[in-house]
Amino acid sequence: MLKLGLGSCPASVIELYLMMSKKNFTQRLPHSELLQLKRWNTPTIYNGWEQITKSDPTCAAINHEVTTDFMPQMGPMVGWAVTVKIEPSNSDYKKGAANRWSEYRSYVANLPGPKIVVIQDLDKPATIGSFWGEVNANIHRSIGCVGTITDGAVRDLDEMTNAGFKALAKRLCVGHAHVVPVEWGCNINVFGQSIAPGQLIHADKHGFLAVPFGEEKGLLDASVFMDKNECETLIKSARNSEGQSLNDLLSAVDQAGKDFGLAARERFGSSGEFGD
């Protein structure tokens, strides 16, 4: 059955839909803090999030399937999730495609940024066509999007890179097939993780972290603290091995692990990766 977007809805209904969607995009962090989060890789941000989350860090927020970062040289990306579903194999969606594209672009453009477009490909596990290429990368960059995460494919890789648009995807492909946005502003599942519109996303070559609502504040401070904690305990001990016997080195690392856990526990109530 053809799933309709907003194409047949009156303007008042579309406006109400947009207002409801924007609720999840209420700015929970200043842009300056997002820029600081972007300076750290995603594992570092995960380490901080792990200390403040109320969720199970073994299953919540992270990808559980392999992602490929096709622009690792661009470093991490940070933004608010714009969620979309596509089904490139289904030609039924081409009916009214121009109007559907227009409404979708208007929806995305009116959301606060920076934005990361997260796309669930309903053709999975097959890969029939790509939503992304040179044209869509440039258009989305112009309306405040910094990149995408899709469990489908991307193409025009060099041209997307030239546009400054980062992509984590399942694979590359040649064509676009019958791709149009099918649904948007909806809950989706990509790479084994559920993502809602407006979630804070941090992503790089390691994968992604979709921060649960309400856990954005304190994320940067926790991440910086845990990174410093590593440097001042375990990494310091490991790098200070010259002239030590093997037993002395191992003893020092053991003590550093205890110090690491104690510092984390005193700050967060949890001892972190290397503590008890």
Language-model segments: residues:
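A contiguous pocket-lining binding segment that forms or flanks enzyme active sites
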Residues: 150, 157-204, 208
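Low-complexity, intrinsically disordered Ser/Thr/Pro- and acidic-rich segments
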Residues: 2-8
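General beta-strand structural signal in soluble alpha/beta enzymes
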Residues: 60-62, 86, 118-120, 148-152, ...
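Buried hydrophobic positions in well-ordered alpha/beta secondary-structure cores of metabolic enzymes
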Residues: 49, 140, 199-201
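Extracellular/luminal Protease-associated
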Residues: 108-151
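Charge-patterned, long linear interaction tracts outside catalytic cores
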Residues: 240-276
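A hydrophobic, small-residue-rich beta->alpha segment in the mid-to-C-terminal subdomain
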Residues: 200-243
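Intrinsically disordered, low-complexity regions enriched in acidic/Ser/Thr/Pro/Gln residues
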Residues: 9, 17-98, 102-111, 116, ...
